[in-house]
């Protein structure tokens, strides 16, 4: 993270592990689900932090376990300032993280924290493609969600949530069309987990899933 030519700050928002990925309940117990979610974050940060263009990785979260894991990997941590009951907690957290990231970076990327199959080269290539646009995004494998949102010299203006791909498109962000299967494979459902069999996952996620079997 000490590349003098790096000019991008990456932000990841993580909710409390006890409240994360409830749609995985048919596959994992509550305790195992927390372990898997944390492991996916570890693998995501590990892949991302090796991208040469990144000057910093900042995780915004209210969860101490997630914060500790992020720090151990060399990421910065911002306690989530979002008040309880906020109508749009994810995008509020990302906007708060963007403010901090822009203290040192003109360009900011918001990345999902549940990309256990992410490869460093995929994110590096996507950032390279994103440089041609003020704002751009990469959809998830279903084409409806957003795995990453990029801003180069422009406000991030995040619209994550239901139908986020369409919302980002309508906001003027350009859709990037590269072949980045790991970058597109965020995990929300048991079917998403099963789809990882064709891609492979990072070591932390592999261990967490193996312990659950």
Swiss-Prot record:
Keywords: GTP-binding, Nucleotide-binding, Nucleotidyltransferase, Transferase. Belongs to the CofC family. It catalyses: phosphoenolpyruvate + GTP + H(+) = enolpyruvoyl-2-diphospho-5'-guanosine + diphosphate. Its EC number is 2.7.7.105. Coiled coil: none annotated. It comes from the Bacteria. PANTHER family: 2-PHOSPHO-L-LACTATE GUANYLYLTRANSFERASE. The gene is fbiD. HAMAP family: CofC. The keyword GTP-binding applies. GO terms for molecular function: GTP binding; phospholactate guanylyltransferase activity. Pathway: Cofactor biosynthesis; coenzyme F420 biosynthesis. Phosphoenolpyruvate binds at residues 146, 161, 164. This is Phosphoenolpyruvate guanylyltransferase. Guanylyltransferase that catalyzes the activation of phosphoenolpyruvate (PEP) as enolpyruvoyl-2-diphospho-5'-guanosine, via the condensation of PEP with GTP. It is involved in the biosynthesis of coenzyme F420, a hydride carrier cofactor.
């Amino acid at each position: 993270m000490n590349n003098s030519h790096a000019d991008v700050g990456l932000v990841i928002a993580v909710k409390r592990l006890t409240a994360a990925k409830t749609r995985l309940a048919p596959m994992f117990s509550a305790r195992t689900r927390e372990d898997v979610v944390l492991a996916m974050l570890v693998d995501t940060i590990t892949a991302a932090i090796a991208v040469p263009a990144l000057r910093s990785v900042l995780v915004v979260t209210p969860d101490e376990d997630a914060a500790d894991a992020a720090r151990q990997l060399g990421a910065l941590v911002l306690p989530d300032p979002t008040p309880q009951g906020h109508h749009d907690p994810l995008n509020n957290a990302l906007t708060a993280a963007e403010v901090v990231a822009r203290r040192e970076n003109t360009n900011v990327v918001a990345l999902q924290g549940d990309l256990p199959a992410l490869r460093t080269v995929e994110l590096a290539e996507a950032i390279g493609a994103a440089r041609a646009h003020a704002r751009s995004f990469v959809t998830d494998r279903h084409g409806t969600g957003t795995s990453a949102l990029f801003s180069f010299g422009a406000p991030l203006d995040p619209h994550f949530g239901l139908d986020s791909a369409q919302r980002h498109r309508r906001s003027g962000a350009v859709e990037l069309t590269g072949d980045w299967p790991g970058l597109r494979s965020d995990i929300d459902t048991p079917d998403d987990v099963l789809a990882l069999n064709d891609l492979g996952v990072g070591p932390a996620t592999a261990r967490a899933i193996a312990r659950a079997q």
